[in-house]
């Protein structure tokens, strides 16, 4: 390299380099089979997400996915041990559905934080640069992600993924919450747009819920998820 030449690393290359240094980053794909408490009180995301919704969402809906996954895995084990292969397809579908619910909710709680206490604002550092590289600007990304979330048909999620094949960030919709592995991607941020996530406060105004949600996004956690996904 000649003297005086300054080289710069692209944001996505910086992600890969930073990931190599993350010694204990939680790998998203390794979500443990455990039901954890929220990292904040149920009322911590007020006024953007109400306490009653958070309580029901976490203690009832997420808990049901966790319990359903445990049951499905236990039934699959019984089928294999007994040789009753006729039920494997049924319980495999149940396991995929409930695993998706447990997996995405475990991420969902962590990519939120109380406004002004880690939640809201705009991403900076490597994540901010990566978003700008992949979407043109943060505002363009926010507009595209919001549109994807509002437009999900029926129940599902809008998700920001790290695509492993070309190491790019992409926005995808998930109807319901399963079949995530078919995309060759790892979700690093997502919003639940099943009605149970917002109906008590916002009724049928999904767009209002999505717009309010940006005030509690935990960008530091999203960045850590990106580093973990790129390892």
Residue map of PLM features:
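N-terminal export signals
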Residues: 1-16
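Acidic, low-complexity proline/glycine-rich segments
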Residues: 22-42
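All-alpha RGS (Regulator of G-protein Signaling) helical domain and cognate RGS-like helical scaffolds
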Residues: 28-32, 60, 71-168
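Short His/Asp/Glu-rich catalytic/ion-coordination signatures at enzyme active sites or charged loops
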Residues: 37-61
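Histidine-centered active-site/metal-ligand motif
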Residues: 57-62, 102-105, 178, 196
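An amphipathic alpha-helical core segment
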Residues: 147-203, 211-220
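Low-complexity, Gly/Ser/Thr/Pro-rich intrinsically disordered linker/tail segments
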Residues: 217-221, 225, 229-231
């Amino acid at each position: 390299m000649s003297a005086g030449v300054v080289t710069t690393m692209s944001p996505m290359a910086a992600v890969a380099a930073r990931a190599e240094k993350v010694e204990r980053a939680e790998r998203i794909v390794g979500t443990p089979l455990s039901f954890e408490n929220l990292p904040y009180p149920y009322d911590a995301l007020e006024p953007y997400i109400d306490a009653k919704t958070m309580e029901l969402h976490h203690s009832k809906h997420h808990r049901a996915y966790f319990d359903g996954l445990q049951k499905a895995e236990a039934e699959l084990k019984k089928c294999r041990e007994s040789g009753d292969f006729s039920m494997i397809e049924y319980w495999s579908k149940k396991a995929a559905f409930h695993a998706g619910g447990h997996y995405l909710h475990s991420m969902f709680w962590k990519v939120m934080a109380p406004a002004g206490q880690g939640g809201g604002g705009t991403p900076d550092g490597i994540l901010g640069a990566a978003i700008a590289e992949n979407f043109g600007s943060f505002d363009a990304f926010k507009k595209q992600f919001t549109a994807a979330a509002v437009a999900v048909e029926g129940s599902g999620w809008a998700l920001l993924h790290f695509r492993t094949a070309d190491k790019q960030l992409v926005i995808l919709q998930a109807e319901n919450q399963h079949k995530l592995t078919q995309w060759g991607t790892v979700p690093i941020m997502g919003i639940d747009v099943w009605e149970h996530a917002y109906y008590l406060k916002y009724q049928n105004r999904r767009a209002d819920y999505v717009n309010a949600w940006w005030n509690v996004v935990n960008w530091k956690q999203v960045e850590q998820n990106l580093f973990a996904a790129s390892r």
